[in-house]
Amino acid sequence: MTTSTPTSRTSATTSTPGTADLTVTEVETIPYRKPLAFASGSVSVAEHVLVRVRTAGGLVGVAEAPPRPFTYGETQASIVAVIQQIFAPAVLGTDALHREQIHARLRRTVGNPTAKAALDMALWDVIGQAFGRPVTELLGGYSDRMRVSHMLGFADPAAMVDEAERMRSTYGITTFKVKVGRRPFRLDVDVCRALREHFGDAVELYVDGNRGWTPSEAARALDAMADLDLTLAEELCPADDVLGRRWLVRHTAIPTVADESATTPGEVTREILGGSADAISIKTARTGFTDSRRILHQCEGLGVEVVMGNQIDGQLGTACAVAFGSAYDATTRRAGELSNFLDMSDDLLTEPLQIQDGTLAVSGRPGIGVTVDEDKLEHYRVDL
């Protein structure tokens, strides 16, 4: 679907950097469905929404919104609806450089984090193109790449060791995020122990509970893994159990990461000052570049670590995540969760992302620096 205003357009290719007309003239939303190469359970496809912004100067910015209905309440249909009915009318006719003005308009509507984030990043893509600079440089320009971590899903210990070994030998990845939260918790303890025994000190391991355990279960599980040198423990308990998570932080020496419980700057303040977390997961898929930057600077001011997270991002979403993560010293200190796109059997970019020697480089081209393959987009798009 498309929301647009009439305008006369000039070619962006003939404009001097910084002189293109950045007035937003059109916002397009295209839902699409891509198959997962390693599907399990009830999840066999990734259902995202491509968000495309056009300007009077002929520039086109893109980003993707990956809905997580059981976490944020968004679906493909809701993302398309809120952008076309509320957000697009609010930004049409506005200069893409007026980021605070646009942000204030989007903020009037509660929720809808990935819809807001995708629109925000598409606008940043336009701005980078207009000035002929990569978004990474506009944001901070600290590095041109990030180390990559890989998520290991639920399986038996041998299978997860094999998967980790494949990732290390094929892509050079040596940091692994292990999904935990099963009952009995010994199932996950056995997996983490098998990984540590197989790799020794050659890899970094941390765990993510996806809110699956009670505080007491989480404490017992972490006690059972105390000798495995886990570097982080992410969202082991329900996101709304503030007191339970606060209790857990006091009972473990492993730094506790807030993810789903800290999705806005206000929630980050609550989690850190209230003692419910020691570190914060930043996901550009839900906070875009604008709010991700706010959260990062909050954490820097409070002396709190950050990790770049992932939301089943495709290659377009991953390009956005690495663009932000590479821009700052604080976000490059830990490996970023930038490998989920490997679970997808196909994607939308004309030049696929490449993980080499355990790192993912940013594109050196202006904006986010990627191009959507229109044939693939047409193949995977769906009608709602």
Where are these regions (language model features)?
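Conserved, mostly hydrophobic/aromatic
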Residues: V51, G58, F87, L119, ...
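Shared catalytic-loop signature of beta/alpha-barrel
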Residues: D229, D240-P255, A262-T359
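Metal- or metallocofactor-binding catalytic centers and their adjacent structured scaffolds
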Residues: D21, E26, R54-A130
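Metal-dependent enolase-superfamily TIM-barrel catalytic cores that perform enediolate-based chemistry
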Residues: E137-T252
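C-terminal extensions of enzymes
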Residues: D343-L384
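N-terminal amphipathic alpha-helix/helix-capping segment at the start of soluble metabolic enzymes
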Residues: T14-E26, S40-S42, R107, G128-Q129, ...
